[in-house]
């Protein structure tokens, strides 16, 4: 069975009160439409058609990809009209219709739905709701089979009492969809072309409308305003928290934890409160992450420890290494096994060897630091001359004294020491002591200046 997917994403979202198209509003660091596209791709379709309207150029620019065919709906005349715009481009046997503002739909739910597309049958995703206000109602016949969908505004009082709602997500034979689109009418309270009308057409044509339901009603929840967007965000985060806990992670408080990307985890990981994981994050066994940390596009090897209020971005922390509190690792940083970065230390594009240490108050940019070397408090690699950046190379077993300025490009040989307060702008050979500071003078009879009174 060949598959193509149509995602309806043309709505304006006036209740968002935003210049940003509704489907581009973020949930967990990705746009709502981005989440839907991600789920769609996991179904391995031939092609994905995205129907766009309001803010079409912005949507196309943000999400352009080779497997996406953007189809313009000039006038927003309903979901049926939107779907019809994509029909001429469809060549597959089966079509799955999704919505760009329904980001939490699970791939497993869609796989179950697609299994219903067999000869003489189509699939419809419905949902049982305590309060179905606003949803189209699933009308069934005396045999319990789906007969039609009636939109809320067109429903009678008896029909509004039905608690089974239409999600709008359906899977249909492509040839049937093309026929149904040509027969749609806008003779209804809204004056729009409803996609839901195809259900009655399918029944009339003798097709069985088989239904599936999501395991969680929030899977099919859309967002029309900021409140609903926040509800989706919180539900997504709790869902991700449950997934990670099932894989061996202890979350101190799942309600105070955010995932904004893709995270893979090992066992016996401990994550404290107010931790944010962004982008692609790999966390191996026995990692401990303290409170109030942000970790982005990074790898944390087995047993790594991140202490409170640290920011890790584009870095690799080696096995048994630790950083923080208040540490910052910037892109390109690699810490070796058991390396230590303490409070108020910043590394950028720096390589630290095994057991190397920078305990506090240091900036190490564009640097290579050998194994077992120690960086004193207040040490800085002066890597930028206003136009270009240069590397500082520190060998193994080096001791860099406190308050050192290392003016790159410069190399400090293995086993060397630099004295506190030094400004090092020349290479230091192996096992040397470098002292580069003015000689102290003690001046007798010196008088402290007296403050001049203002007139």
From Swiss-Prot:
Residues 1-226 are annotated as: Pyrophosphorylase. Its EC number is 2.7.7.23, 2.3.1.157. Disulfide bonds: none annotated. It holds the Pfam family NTP_transf_3. The active site is at residue 360. One of its GO terms (biological process) is cell wall organization. CDD domains: GT2_GlmU_N_bac, LbH_GlmU_C. It catalyses: alpha-D-glucosamine 1-phosphate + acetyl-CoA = N-acetyl-alpha-D-glucosamine 1-phosphate + CoA + H(+); N-acetyl-alpha-D-glucosamine 1-phosphate + UTP + H(+) = UDP-N-acetyl-alpha-D-glucosamine + diphosphate. The keyword Protein transport does not apply. It is an enzyme of class 2 (transferase). Keywords: Acyltransferase, Cell shape, Cell wall biogenesis/degradation, Cytoplasm, Magnesium, Metal-binding, Multifunctional enzyme, Nucleotidyltransferase, Peptidoglycan synthesis, Repeat, Transferase. Mg(2+) binds at residues 101, 224. Residues 248-455 are annotated as: N-acetyltransferase. It is found in: Cytoplasm. In the N-terminal section; belongs to the N-acetylglucosamine-1-phosphate uridyltransferase family. This is Bifunctional protein GlmU. It comes from Pseudomonas fluorescens (strain SBW25). The gene is glmU.
